[in-house]
From Swiss-Prot:
PROSITE patterns: RIBOSOMAL_S21 (PS01181). GO terms for biological process: translation. This is Small ribosomal subunit protein bS21. It comes from Porphyromonas gingivalis (strain ATCC BAA-308 / W83). It comes from the Bacteria. The keyword Ribonucleoprotein applies. GO terms for cellular component: ribonucleoprotein complex; ribosome. Keywords: Ribonucleoprotein, Ribosomal protein. Belongs to the bacterial ribosomal protein bS21 family. GO terms for molecular function: structural constituent of ribosome.
């Protein structure tokens, strides 16, 4: 469970923004979407490799 204490005099919008950031970092939404349908381990591995190659190409192009 995510707990975001609201500080004295803190704007509720700012506290909500901190909550959203913490929630996003936990990866709960990503995990729920991934678990909606079964994915074979070989397919998951292939996707992971393709993503790694893509990120590597972006890094090389950036330099």
């Amino acid at each position: 469970m995510i707990v975001v204490p609201v500080k004295e005099g803190e704007n509720i919008e700012r506290a909500l923004k901190r909550f959203k950031r913490k929630f996003e970092k936990t990866g709960a939404v990503r995990e729920l979407r991934a678990r909606q349908a079964f994915e074979k381990p070989s397919v998951a591995k292939r996707k992971k490799m393709q993503k790694a190659i893509y990120v590597k190409q972006l890094q090389v192009a950036e330099e």
